[in-house]
Amino acid sequence: MFSYILFDLDGTLSDPKQGICGSVQYALKSFGIDEPDLDRLEPFIGPPLRDSFMRYYDFTPEQAEAAVAKYRERFSVTGKYENTLYPGITVLLHDLEQAGAKLAVASSKPTVYVEDILVHFGIRQYFDIVVGSELDGTRDRKEEVVLEALRQLAQRYGAKPWEVVMVGDRSFDIEGAKAAGTHNIAVAYGYAQPGELEQAGAEIIVRDVQGLRQVLLGGAGHFARQGAGQNGRQDGWQTAGQNVWQNAGQNERQNGWQNARQPGRGAGQEPPVGSSRRYRSSTWQSTGQGSAAGTWQNAGQGS
């Protein structure tokens, strides 16, 4: 078991869609933009808000700053509480603490909001360290957040980067962990787009909280790489349990999903397209060896 575990917040510990997307919707209205479909705003969950306003709505830096200010008008009052913990998270945190792990939160969300949310859900006591961004926009890159969390863990406990694992749901979490020299685990129940976590080079991908529990309490042995191509597979991913997929050495492959339960079910069906919400809530998995989309099949739990 890893002694030091960093958790992302949004899309990893909790589902913040209503609060974040509702607050983005509120900010856009101040610019005369009406976006009634919250699903279309899901890409705002995870990365820095300024970047997202510029990327998805072509805002100038000045407009993006103003949009963030409007966003916070709503989020700071009601939005941060329009949020739910994923089932099983509280028990997982309790059991990790009882097992002796040191836990931290490493989020791109401002620290003041992270603290409020953790207290609101009654889970603040499980975390030794909480690191987020600053309200002035500094330290909002995931690498910076992870490095600050590592600095505090090293100062307090003497932790080394290779003794730490970062758990998150977006490519930013995986890339930040890799840049900081830590291990990483990606959760597929969050807000990643199809193929995003594989492309980012996640060491392990878990489908649900039970899979995350299996890896975190099961030991660091899940990170021992297996030889690609076992059992005739041409991709770089190997099944490490019913809810866990492990990178066996070919991070660049986008089609490396295998069904650990019912390999033949629903073969040839097309996956939901362009919706991270559907990707999150269902168990559509790629088993193909062609394009990034591959051949998709339903493992038994529809959206």
Give the positions of each predicted feature.
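Active-site neighborhood of HAD-like aspartate-dependent phosphohydrolases
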Residues: 1-43, 57
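Metal-dependent phosphoesterase signature
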Residues: 54-94, 99
